[in-house]
Amino acid sequence: MPELPEVETTRRGIAPHLEGQRVSRVVVRERRLRWPIPEDLDVRLSGQRIVLVERRAKYLLINAEVGTLISHLGMSGNLRLVEVGLPAAKHEHVDIELESGMALRYTDPRRFGAMLWSQDPHNHELLLRLGPEPLTELFDGDRLFQLSRGKSMAVKPFIMDNAVVVGVGNIYATEALFAAGIDPRRAAGGISRGRYLKLAIEIKRVLAAAIERGGTTLRDFIGGDGQPGYFQQELFVYGRGGEACKVCGTELRNVVLGQRASVFCPRCQR
């Protein structure tokens, strides 16, 4: 599933080609995504100029002069730029055609993504209760410490809770916990403030590094420019269960937390 770095990579790839451009038409070949694409999307968006492309958590917000297209890539979706008129392959469900001669093409084999329209996106029900962005000053170790008090749940699903902080998905939670030396099974409420300060720093570092390297391509993610991400080459623990820890050589262990697979080093993480 595309996580925050992959979505931010997509935003950075498509924004220069969209911002300031006018939409000539919207071609929808399949409306049945996680939520149906609005029947009147073409009417609402065509003729409008795209003002700004933003990201909120794992949602892309394509802001027009009036209204905003909210897009989510789901489990395996992607957005990329193609030339208008390029024949669509299977699973290529939407083209937003621009007067420049380019089109933003949405591909989603599993159809778990979304394309919705809103006049007030930040108050949309999907975005309204989201926590702070992890790479801003609104997120820090003190927030983690305060929100974790009294919680018996494991720390990994705690930091993956979008009400606590957005965009810390399975890959990056696993890597940040390793970097901070924290066992992902440890109760969130039993971790000290000092360790949370360290964890917040590592969450920011890991996410920033992944964005810089274009995200993590583990299966089928490609960025808005059609290129894969390269952060998978720097993964220390994610997907490496049973292999030797790159730091100490101990065999990495697999565990399931919050219905998600996780990997950790029993020696480096306490």
UniProtKB/Swiss-Prot annotation:
One of its GO terms (biological process) is base-excision repair. Keywords: DNA damage, DNA repair, DNA-binding, Glycosidase, Hydrolase, Lyase, Metal-binding, Multifunctional enzyme, Zinc, Zinc-finger. It catalyses: Hydrolysis of DNA containing ring-opened 7-methylguanine residues, releasing 2,6-diamino-4-hydroxy-5-(N-methyl)formamidopyrimidine; 2'-deoxyribonucleotide-(2'-deoxyribose 5'-phosphate)-2'-deoxyribonucleotide-DNA = a 3'-end 2'-deoxyribonucleotide-(2,3-dehydro-2,3-deoxyribose 5'-phosphate)-DNA + a 5'-end 5'-phospho-2'-deoxyribonucleoside-DNA + H(+). Its cofactor is Zn(2+). DNA binds at residues 91, 110, 151. It comes from the Bacteria. Belongs to the FPG family. This is Formamidopyrimidine-DNA glycosylase. It comes from Pseudomonas fluorescens (strain SBW25). The gene is mutM.
